[in-house]
Amino acid sequence: MDNNYKVDEQKKGLHFNIYNYIWGGLIILFLAFLYRINCIYPYVTDDFDYSFIYGETTRLEGIHDIFVSQARHYMEWSGRYIVHFLAQLMLSMDKAVFNILNVIHYAGLSTLICLLSTKKIHLHIWLLILLTLWCIMPQPGATVFWLTGSFNYIWAAGMVIAFTVCLLSQYRPLNITALFLAIPAGNTHESLVMGVFVSLVLYSILTKKKNKLHIIALLLFFAGVLSNILAPGTFQRLQTAGVQGDSGIQALCIKCLVSVYKIIKGIFSTSCDWGVQVCVVLFIITSVYLIRKVLNKKQTTTDILALCFLFGALCNVCMILPTGLTYGRVLFGFCFLSYLAFCVAFLSKLLLLPRYLNLIILTSTVVLCSIPCINAYATVSIFAHRMKYIESCAKKGEKTIRDLPISEQITHRYVDTSCMFPNENQNHFAALYFNTGEFSVLSPRIYQIMEEHSQAMQKMPPDEWVVTNENHVIYCLKEKPKKSEILVDAFGSTSSLDKYLPQFIKNLHKPGRRHTIINLFTMHGKYFATWDMQAPTGKLIIHYNEKTQPQEVYFNIEEQRCSK
């Protein structure tokens, strides 16, 4: 009898070890996938900006430069000095350092969520979190893989969860650690930390926590929140987004209602990031489950914590309503706290299920998550190839670069498509980063776009018309320019270009405005000029260097920086 019992116990232990090896192998495989994605994901948009001292064209060369940059950044653009300091620190190093640290941080964040949900590390639950967290976050390309974006979102979440775990721990040393994490965590991201703060305060009230360390840590966390929200740069950024402090309560309420409408409409739109839709479903499921438990008076302290996180998720939505911004990653705070509430409410229940049900859940999760993994790798690979192509063209001296047709396969979920067609950041700082002259990128469908717009164009004088596309003004010229060189002074005169460009484009030449290179081409016998209105000011010298191709004539443009 005893021998049979020992054999049964040995078999159980053997099965346990086998499953642990499987889970461990899948964890290593997934982390290797994340590392590979990080390696091929290129620098884009803000990565170029933050490689320089803010407001200057001087490359970062040390910690002192980062402090100078962040002091100016805090006053002029954003109060998130912690995450942006870390981003600039990483950008001053080789990207290989970030590639490794980002994977380690993601694994650490998943571990903290596991601890918050089940109090211990269980490999199969840790694997579930690793697979699903990045997958259902809005725009993981911008919130997880993109260097600057990752610090603003997933790293911010990591610091906030580290603070939360330490704060709620029963061990005094961790409570003391929470005091040191409080201000940095509170400063990370305003649309995330406000919801977390409300959640933790509400949880403290409902569970009647009176620990002095707990209260002090919350006050320090709120101080970090205020250091972000009340930063001079935060108000400047809000004004840029169209939020005016003196616009009146009525106008602000209307704007909030419009934002609510946009969010609800966006959730049901086919173009909505499906990660946001999944998080909305998780929010609803968790809310129904917890409300039923509360009504039946069967709630536990864990259920109360999950309910507080749900309330915090709604607070995060309220934080963004006045801005009018409702696109994918703006909803990161809502999505993350909804996901966290779901994990806290349900993951511990998996430990009570039979082994075969856990196997079914894990197998289904692995299969389902492999699909976005494949899509992410394919999309990021295409995007990386595109950025290398643009860099190589810029280094060859090309001023106007027609994008690769394959770029149209890139979707916004796994890549930040706001950087697809260069604006001020790309045209200026990318050129500085690549150590090339200014350049502009046109859509691979520029000629098809012109044809599509030709029937619904903005009418100008006879035989002239203007359309706008991808930040470019496209203007149909009356005739082919005759001079071999035309000088355009961004601070006043337009010399020979007067007869070819309409007055509203010529008026763009004013001090403080930003413009870019003009690209001239022909299509079906007509001549067109394209103008990107967001690139740096300066003197534009247009050299005609015709390369005759079917229905196309390109004119290369060079720019000379103006010292004014």
Residue ranges and their predicted role:
Residues 3-7, 19-77, 81, 91-111, ...:
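Intrinsically disordered, polar/acidic, low-complexity terminal segments
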Residues 9-18, 167-177, 204-215, 291-302, ...:
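Membrane-interface junctions at the ends of membrane-embedded or membrane-associated helices
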Residues 20-33, 126-131, 180, 217-222:
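Alpha-helical transmembrane segments
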Residues 23, 99, 174-178, 213, ...:
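Residue-level signature of transmembrane alpha-helical entry/exit and packing/kink sites
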Residues 35-96, 100, 147, 182-310, ...:
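Transmembrane catalytic cores of multi-pass membrane glycosyltransferases
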Residues 80, 125-168, 189, 276-279, ...:
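Membrane-interface micro-motifs in multi-pass membrane enzymes
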Residues 106-117, 159-168, 197-205, 283-291, ...:
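Transmembrane alpha-helical segments
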Residues 326-379, 385:
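C-terminal structural cap/anchor segments
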